[in-house]
Amino acid sequence: MTLKIFIERPVLSTVISVILVILGILGLIAMPITQYPEIAPPTVQVSASYPGANADVVLNSVIVPLEEQINGVENMTYMTSTAGNDGSASITVFFKQGTNPDLDAVNVQNRVSRATPLLPADVTRSGVVTSKRQSSMVMVFSINSSNKSFDGTFLQNYANINVIPMLKRVNGVGDVQAFGTQDYSMRIWLRPDAMASYGLVPDDITNALAEQNIEAAPGKIGENSNQSFQFVLKYKGRLKLPVEYENIIIKADSTGQLLRLKDVARVELGSLDYSVTMSTDNKPSIVMGVFQAAGTNAHAMIKECDSVIATAARSFPPGVSMNMIFTANQFLDISIHKVVETLIEAFILVSIVVFVFLQDLRSTLIPAIAVPVAIVGTFFFLNLFGFTINLLTLFALVLAIGIVVDDAIVVVEAVHAKLDQHAPTATEATLTAMNEISGAVISITLVMAAVFVPVTFITGSVGVFYKQFGLTLAVAILISAVNALTLSPALCALLLRPHHENALRQKGFLQRFYSAFNAAFGATTKKYKRSIQFLARRRWIAGLAVLVFIGLFAFLLKVTPAGFVPNEDQSFIMADVSLPPASSLERTTKIADQVMTIARQQPEMNSVVRVAGSGILSGGAGGSYGSLFMNLKDWDLRKGEEHSLTAVINKLFGATAGIKGAKIFFIAPPTLEGFGNTSGF
C-alpha cells in the first residue's frame, strides 16, 4: 500500500510538509497586499484644456469629436465625460474586467490621434493627455503655509517642481492631480477704453505676443567661410519679466512713434487660473490627489509615495508643511492586522477545543502541526494563481482552519479507536486505521472541493470575489487531505502510545477536569438523544420548525439592506457643495468656509481642507462648486458608535441643514478602489 511508505518513513512525510511550508513562505513574501482583489475595470482617462472656453464650448468642440472617435475601441464597456467652465475636458473610458490596461491605453491613444485634427488649435497646442489610472484617489494630501509670504500660487508651483515629478516616478502611480491650475503665468489685463481708442482688438495683442515672445534658432556666422572664427548666435528666448512684456511693440505709425503693450494693458505675474481657492484649517494650501494605475500594487505604491513625500518635506521652505488627509493604507493596514489576529485566535481556539475533546497533548499536537502546514502552504498556490493577500483570502483561511483540522482529527480518532481495540503498537494501529479511512478522507476532500470550485467560474467583478474566496478554501482543503494521508499518519505512529501503557495515571487537575467534562458532555448527549426521540414521535413539530425558519429566512432576506460590499469607516469624509448655476466663486467660498467651520467644531475631526471651484459629485470645475476633505481622528480616539464615521456624517448633515442657498452632501470614500469616487450610491 502506498500510504504504508509514509507511515514507515516519517522523514519522507516531514520533507513533503517542510517543502510545502517553504514554498508557502516564499509565496507569502512575494504576494502583494491589497484590501480587496483587483476587481475594478481598467480605466483610461483622456484630458484636455481649452483656455477661455465655457462648458458648452468645451462639450461641442472638444468632447464630442473625441467621444466619436473613442467610441467602440476594443474591449470598451462605456465612457463618461465632464466639461468645466474653466475650459477643462475629461473623458474616462471603462474596459472589460481582465483586459490589459497598457494595451487599452494604446488603443485609446490611437483613437485620440484620429480626433486631433478636428480639435481647436488652442487645445492641440496645450496637448491632449491619455493616461491609465483608476477613477478613485488612493491618497489625498495638502501642502500648507503658515508664512504669509507663501500663497497658494507659490505652493502650487513649488509642488509642480519639487513634489509632483517625484511622485509620478513611483511605480504604480497613474496620475498626480492638483486641484486647480495655479501655475505662474504672465497675466495681461487689457484696458477696453485704450484698446478702442487705438482701434485694436484682442487678436492684435495675441499676434504681437506670438511674433515677439518666441524661442528662435538664429543659427551661426562664419561657418564654411574664410574667416578665422565662427560663432553660434544666441537669442534671449521667451520673455520672463513683466517689464519685458510691457515693452512689446503692438504697432508703429509713420512718424516712428511706437505703441507698446503697457499703453493698452496692465501686465503682472500671477496665476494661470483663479477659478479654484484652497485652504487647510484656514491656512493657504494646495490639495493633491494620487491615483493608482490599473493592475498595480496599491499598498506598495502608497508606502513609496509616503517615503517620497517625507523626503520632500524635509526641504520645504520655512512655514510650509504637509498634511496627510487620506491614505488607503491607513485602513488597509489595520484591517489586515485585525484579520491576522483573528486567524491566530481561530487557530488557538481550535487547538483548545481539540485538546479538550481528545484529552491528550500528544493527540492535540498532530492537528496543531497539520493546520499551519495547510494554511502556510496555501500561499504558494495563491501566488501561483496571481492572487493578493487581501481581506477575502485571509477570511477564507480563517474559515479553512475549522475545515482542515477535521482531516487530522479523523485520522487521530481512527488511530485511537484501533488503540482502544488493543492494537499492540501505534504503527500497526495507524496502518489498520488508514486502510479503513483513506477512501473516506479522499471522498470528503472531493465533496468539499465540489462545493467551492464551481463558484470560481462566475465571471465579472463579483466573480473575482468568488474565485479568490473559493480557490483559497479549495487549495487549503486539498493540502489538508495531503497532510491527512502523509504527515498525520506519520505523526500518529511517532507520537501516540498504546492505551494500556497509560491506563494507570495519577489523579491530577487535568484528570479531574476531564472527568467532569466527560460527565457533563455525557449528560448533554443524553438530553440530545431524548429530544431527538421526542421529535421523531412528533414529526409535525420538526416540520413546523423548518417552515418557521424558512419563513424567517425569507423575511430577513427581504428586509435586510443589500449591497456589494459593506461601507467601512476609513476615517475620511468628503463633502460636496453645490450652489445654483452662475454663482460666483466668492459666494461659494463663503459657504464652503461655513461648512469648514462647522466641521472643525466636531470633536472627532482632525483636520479639514476646503476647495472652492471644484466639485466631487459633479466631477467638474466651476465657481458654483465646492468640496471639502475631512480627516478624522484615529479609531482608538473615536471609540463608541456615537463617534463612528456614520454618526459624524449624520451630525454634519444636521449641523449644516441651516445653511441656505446650497446643496451640501457628506459622503465617505469608496470601499473598493476604482469603483467610483464615493461610497453609498
Labelled PLM ranges:
Residues I401-V415, S438-F457, V464-Y514, L628:
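Transmembrane alpha-helices and their membrane-interface boundaries in multi-pass membrane transporters
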Residues D273-T296:
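Small-residue transmembrane helix packing/gating motifs
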Residues M1-I33, I437, K507-V565, K651:
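Signature of alpha-helical transmembrane segments and their immediate interfacial
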Residues L23-Q35, Q45, I348-H416, F457, ...:
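Hydrophobic transmembrane alpha-helices and their membrane-interface caps
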Residues I325, L332, I336, V412, ...:
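Helix-loop junctions and hydrophobic alpha-helical segments within the transmembrane domains
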Residues F291-T296, I302-L349, F381, I389:
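Membrane-helix entry/capping segments
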Residues V11, I19-V57, S113-V123, F387, ...:
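Transmembrane helices with small-residue packing motifs
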Residues T14, V21, L26, A30, ...:
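Surface-exposed amphipathic alpha-helical segments in non-transmembrane regions
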